[in-house]
């Protein structure tokens, strides 16, 4: 099975490397305006495959995306230190206007997996440009924020993060919503589990975890310029869900007819992901405060997309 990645920068190359380690694809094609960069990353990653799985990693052109089951869109300009994801919008929408038609010309049946920030608005841009059904344009959304939330809860509770079920919804960015009210550990409500574990969550603990999730990207960008390992692993996991028709539930971004009264907006909700992309949405139970926060997040994203005409 073939997977394409458009954009061979830090996120695109990290995704290709994660795919090689997972071994879910048989061929990964890197496409970039800088052909030497794509070739260098492809060659370097190919040399890792003897230690992992037999994956053919190569650089190519848009035409080489023919037959791809999924294409990751990681093309765009990098986020600057202190720059919000929404501030990237004007600079990256123009990139997609060139990229999306060329991808679909070569791979008209592919699921488009959007990684470029601000990812929720760029998902809406890609959806409008593509003319595809909403489910076939999937943004990485808050998968990484959700992973951070679960990891920090697990660290506090001293349990495996795989046993923590908690979501971050809405924008992948400043207005994201951490859903505390329905969080569970091993099927037990979070606060009940924390008490039984002797690791009660004080207001200070909650504030620390909230800050840890919400500000993680800014801290990483300040320290090393960009985030790529975490999101690369997350994108590879989404590709695996598509290629294997997994039907797992992930907090990915997709065009949504209505969210808390806000119409036609792309944002993250728990969604069932399979071979055709998003196959359904699982709307979680929310507290009144979380519902209002999700509505505000949806409005922010709606306004940003509307300003561009999308």
UniProtKB/Swiss-Prot annotation:
It is an enzyme of class 1 (oxidoreductase). Keywords: Allosteric enzyme, Cytoplasm, NAD, Oxidoreductase, Phosphoprotein. It catalyses: (S)-lactate + NAD(+) = pyruvate + NADH + H(+). GO terms for molecular function: L-lactate dehydrogenase activity. The active site is at residue 172. Pathway: Fermentation; pyruvate fermentation to lactate; (S)-lactate from pyruvate: step 1/1. The keyword NAD applies. It is found in: Cytoplasm. Gene3D superfamilies: Lactate dehydrogenase/glycoside hydrolase, family 4, C-terminal, NAD(P)-binding Rossmann-like Domain. It comes from the Bacteria. Beta-D-fructose 1,6-bisphosphate binds at residues 150, 165. Substrate binds at residues 79, 85, 117-120, 145-148, 227. The modification Phosphotyrosine is found at residue 218. GO terms for cellular component: cytoplasm. Catalyzes the conversion of lactate to pyruvate. This is L-lactate dehydrogenase. The gene is ldh.
